[in-house]
Amino acid sequence: MAAGYDLAGRVCRELHRAGLSAYVERPGASKQPGVWVEVNGQGEHAGGLYVRWSAPELAEAGMRAVTERQDPAAPEWKRYAEVVLLIQTALIGILRLAGFSVVRAEEVDDVAEGDVYVHADAIGREDS
């Protein structure tokens, strides 16, 4: 796990260099807006990272609109979903430029939609 946290620190540094707020997610730590970097400690991709964008205000507005109006196509929800995809694309580009091996997290974990996955052997490996 120590190697995973080292990798998470390097990812956060690169995101900070690009002007983004980024934090390593740790148990019990409060969630902040920006990019969360979570170390994956299980399964065949153990040691890799999930990189997740957090915009609580935007997410809450989208979820509230869907819940209150019972409308999964609510404009507020669509806006949130589109922002998540735009940020995902930007994060992939930023991290690949820095030399990390990254993919859309859905390619590794089908329930991680909108996240980015950084492979454990991220530095020095060609991207797929």
Locate the predicted segments by residue:
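Acidic, proline/glycine-rich low-complexity IDRs
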Residues: 89-128
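N-terminal leader/targeting segments
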Residues: 1-64
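Short, hydrophobic/π-rich interface segment
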Residues: 67, 71-99
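Surface-exposed beta-strand edges and their flanking turn/coil or helix-capping segments
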Residues: 63-66, 117
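A short, exposed loop/beta-hairpin motif centered on an aromatic-Gly-Thr core
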Residues: 1, 78-82, 109
